[in-house]
Amino acid sequence: MTDQQNTVADDESAPQFSLQRIYVRDLSFEAPKSPAIFRQQWEPSVGLDLNTRQTALEADFHEVVLTLSVTVKNGDEVAFIAEVQQAGIFLIKNLDEASMSHTLGAFCPNILFPYAREALDSLVTRGSFPALMLAPVNFDALYAQELQRLQSAGENTVQ
């Protein structure tokens, strides 16, 4: 009986991660030069802005929002601008501060990215433009770069 009680106590203090919900928080599309843009030779240049933010909700629940903003130009003219805010609610318990930061800053965005990419691609094709095939993003590398940038900024302010 004692072994079972210890197992239950250990399980309660063990790290826990659970995806509760994935949803589109915001979605927008603009094609300012349509329909004239459709008659031009298509030579696009794609600009991608990526951002994440985290919000602590009630007890152990966190919202992570991944924002992808794409601006596609054909020559010097903007063909379209598309943006999606893909969000998720995650239950995260019993992690130390560094693990929690990594989970919210890299692991959760990795989960959200395929959903955001699909939402953008669907939006773009519904606007009658060619499919937008975004390459995978290495959120672990981006997270490491951000940590390094913050550490460097902290060292510069101390000096």
Swiss-Prot record:
Signal peptide: none annotated. The keyword Disulfide bond does not apply. One of its GO terms (cellular component) is cytoplasm. GO terms for molecular function: unfolded protein binding. GO terms for biological process: protein folding; protein tetramerization; protein transport. It is found in: Cytoplasm. Its main location: cytoplasm. InterPro entries: SecB, SecB-like_sf. Keywords: Chaperone, Cytoplasm, Protein transport, Translocation, Transport. It comes from the Bacteria. The keyword Metal-binding does not apply. Belongs to the SecB family. Homotetramer, a dimer of dimers. One homotetramer interacts with 1 SecA dimer. NCBIfam families: PRK05751.1-4, secB. HAMAP family: SecB. One of the proteins required for the normal export of preproteins out of the cell cytoplasm. It is a molecular chaperone that binds to a subset of precursor proteins, maintaining them in a translocation-competent state. It also specifically binds to its receptor SecA. This is Protein-export protein SecB. It comes from Pseudomonas fluorescens (strain ATCC BAA-477 / NRRL B-23932 / Pf-5). The lineage of its organism: Bacteria, Pseudomonadati, Pseudomonadota, Gammaproteobacteria, Pseudomonadales. The gene is secB.
